[in-house]
Amino acid sequence: MNAFQWKIAIAAVLSLPTLAAAGTTQTCNDNILKGQYVLAASGFTRPAASGPGTPWVPKAILEVLNFNGDGTLTTPGVTIANPFGDTGAVLDAPVGAPGDYSISEDCSGTLRFHDINSVTYKIFVKPPLGDTIWLIQTNPANNVFQGSATRVY
């Protein structure tokens, strides 16, 4: 083997770990979310059917979510600050609405609560363990709301 062939052989051997890593893609599905998570989110809201120029007011939520690993979830506790606009109210409901979720192989998905407003979030799950979820609310309209949920057990 001449010097050029040795260089090619060494370069090929050194690049094998990189090629192996490139072939291992992270995949997700519904069972990546199991256990109890705490969601902290904030943003802005305004009354339903508000027209242009209607002021936005702050809103925040702290919520406990129990993911069952099968596409369903329950909400054993929720506290919402200023949920209905500029009232300043803080609601501490004993339980929130149940819901469902769907996670794609690329770790993106949706989460929907079975409440009167069908509150829905676009989500992204942190692979490989699913211990963090990033969320942005997509329904109902007149909400700009985002946050993250962290597995606590």
PLM segments and residue spans:
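Bacterial N-terminal signal peptides that target proteins for export
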Residues: 1-10
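Bacterial N-terminal signal peptides
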Residues: 9-18
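Mature soluble binding/inhibitory domains
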Residues: 21-153
